[in-house]
């Protein structure tokens, strides 16, 4: 087939824009062929662009050349057409298409390019493995659901820029090549050719730079910024990701929260037409853990924790009494009305499930009309059983699922059990968007791997004022001026008020196990800057990918990122990372010490 050019042909409309009000209008459309079907003496071609689809009609009785050319059109051919918009007859209206009231009667057709048969259908909800989709990502991105996701992402960032600009924020870019200050996830390192033996790090966040901007007097800053973390991937993690980042001077927590509730209210209304209620619930960290076993609770459903430690602390069942005696707890959830759906097989499966989270197993009591179904009631007295039933408000049809262990194990295991039960029994209302703030976090958490306290958020978080005196003596009891914004059980953003005094910052580093010299080696630039009139300041950063993922109703952030990585941190379309020339390594003063055989290199190149 001979291909043509646009020449003097100029597009007048996008495919998805047309409707009955355009009747008799002459239009020029361009896009991809989605379908081609013949009915009598008419060819019907569905034309697609990013705005949607429209039906084209080619009639052999009016222009045989154009009609014959249309017969050879195949899926994903790129074409341009000129024609007239006609209203469909009532019986031919397609109510499933936004453009279903009209069709375009084509008088001129230009075939701009052909296409091989794609490896998967270019349509919504395809059943294709992710590796194939990502290898041919340029085709995957043509699919309507992916294009909707990308357009939603664009809307969110556009609304963010408008909102923060209107609220006095300046958009300022911070460096991509910065200093490695390892504390938390691993850095991606970039070797310096000019200063051999030295490395830049790609930023895990713009944290220190945005604090410097507050020192510099810019008052309110924001940025849509790429960040990098060399860590193991999950469904909602990528090695490179996007933050909507902000920092403010001379503010308290209420001011930061109010500004961000205003932003979320605006973005949901303008991007999705959804009204969300503000202010959001604020829940202290300890309350979140005691009620849900999580610092990012999903509040779209119940199944809240019930502490039955007092009811069983003296019982004959050593799993329970021993847990309480050793400083742990016994907690449960009441799965109301679903006891008859929890067979012994399902209960055993759930018991195995919690072992993933270091629990030794799960106990249960299923309340039936005239009896109890349980593997533990034989170890409990009637009074203890009645106390449990009373505390859990259990009635026939309910199932009480119980975990006993150290508190951190109980929180983790029962919290994940709560989510698993909700998923299995469809207890989650996916139409809801439930926001809340989690506040009053611990400043530190203990790392058994490192045998020291590490920062719960980051080492620049300001302690609660009345807890500062405990930094050296009771670090486990120091609270942070920190806050996370939670949506449907996912942390979509987090922030804090920052330390703005060099002496307090040095005390913080000491509590984290840094010597004076180590602290100044890594962060001396910040503590030096604090000597020159630092204002009180604080901020917040959203995980933009995760926020858009939830808004779009996707299961993975890969579906809202144009060119994501897979779990091996590979990008399958361009096949990165890749080997580089020996000459490039020599220029950097780098020698590869890990042997790579030719077969492995060839396989990597052909992934």
Identify what each model region corresponds to.
Residues 1-607:
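Class II aminoacyl-tRNA synthetase catalytic cores and aaRS-like
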């Amino acid at each position: 087939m001979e291909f043509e050019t646009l020449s003097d042909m100029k597009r007048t409309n996008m495919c998805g824009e047309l409707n009955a009000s355009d009747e008799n209008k002459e239009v020029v459309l361009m896009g991809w062929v989605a379908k081609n079907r013949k009915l009598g003496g008419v060819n019907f071609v569905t034309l697609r662009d990013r705005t949607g689809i429209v039906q084209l009609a080619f009639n052999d009785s009016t222009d045989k050349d154009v009609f014959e050319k249309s017969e050879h059109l195949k899926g994903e051919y790129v074409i341009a057409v000129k024609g007239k918009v006609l209203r469909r007859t009532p019986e031919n209206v397609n109510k499933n298409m936004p453009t279903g009231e009209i069709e375009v009667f084509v008088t001129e057709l230009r075939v701009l390019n052909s296409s091989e048969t794609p490896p998967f259908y270019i349509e919504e909800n395809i059943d294709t493995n992710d590796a194939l989709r990502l290898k041919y990502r340029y085709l995957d991105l043509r699919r309507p659901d992916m294009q909707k996701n990308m357009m939603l992402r664009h809307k969110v960032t556009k609304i963010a820029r408008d909102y923060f600009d209107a609220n006095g924020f300046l958009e300022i870019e911070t460096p991509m090549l910065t200093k490695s200050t390892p504390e938390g996830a691993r850095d991606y390192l970039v070797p310096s050719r000019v200063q051999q033996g030295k490395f830049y790090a790609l930023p895990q966040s713009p944290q220190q730079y945005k604090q410097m901007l507050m020192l510099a007097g810019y008052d309110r800053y924001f940025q849509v910024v790429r960040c990098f973390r060399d860590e193991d991937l999950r469904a909602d993690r990528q090695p490179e990701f996007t933050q909507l980042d902000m920092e403010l001077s001379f503010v308290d927590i209420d001011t930061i929260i109010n500004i961000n509730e205003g932003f979320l209210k605006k973005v949901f209304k303008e991007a999705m037409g959804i009204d969300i209620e503000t202010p959001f619930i604020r829940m202290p960290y300890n309350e979140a853990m005691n009620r849900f076993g999580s610092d990012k609770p999903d509040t779209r459903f119940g199944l809240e924790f019930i502490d039955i430690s007092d009811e069983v602390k003296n019982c004959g069942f050593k799993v329970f009494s021993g847990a309480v005696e050793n400083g742990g707890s016994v907690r449960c959830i009441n799965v109301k009305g679903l006891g008859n759906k929890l067979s012994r097989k399902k209960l055993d499966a759930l018991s195995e499930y919690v072992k993933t989270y270091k629990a030794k197993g799960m106990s249960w009591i299923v309340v039936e009309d005239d009896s109890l179904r349980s593997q533990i009631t034989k170890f409990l007295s009637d009074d203890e059983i009645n106390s449990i039933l009373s505390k859990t408000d259990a009635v026939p049809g309910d199932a009480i699922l119980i975990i006993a262990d150290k508190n951190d194990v109980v929180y983790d295991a029962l919290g994940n059990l709560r989510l698993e039960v909700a998923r299995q029994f469809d207890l989650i209302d996916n139409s809801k968007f439930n926001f809340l703030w989690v506040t009053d976090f611990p400043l530190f958490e203990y790392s058994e791997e490192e045998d020291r306290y590490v920062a719960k958020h980051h080492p620049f978080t300001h302690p609660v004022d009345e807890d500062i005196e405990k930094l050296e003596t009771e670090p486990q009891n120091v609270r942070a001026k920190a806050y996370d914004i939670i949506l449907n059980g996912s942390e979509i953003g987090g922030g804090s008020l920052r330390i703005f005094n060099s002496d307090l910052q040095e005390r913080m580093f000491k509590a984290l196990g840094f010597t004076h010299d180590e602290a100044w080696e890594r962060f001396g630039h910040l503590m030096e800057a604090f000597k020159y009139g630092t204002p009180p300041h604080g901020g917040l950063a959203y995980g933009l990918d995760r926020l858009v993922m939830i808004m779009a109703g996707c299961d993975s952030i890969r579906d809202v990122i144009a060119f994501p990585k897979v779990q091996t941190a590979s990008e399958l379309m361009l096949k990165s990372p890749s080997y580089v020339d020996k000459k490039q390594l020599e220029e950097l003063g780098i020698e590869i010490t890990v042997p790579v055989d030719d077969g492995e290199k060839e396989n990597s190149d052909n992934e």
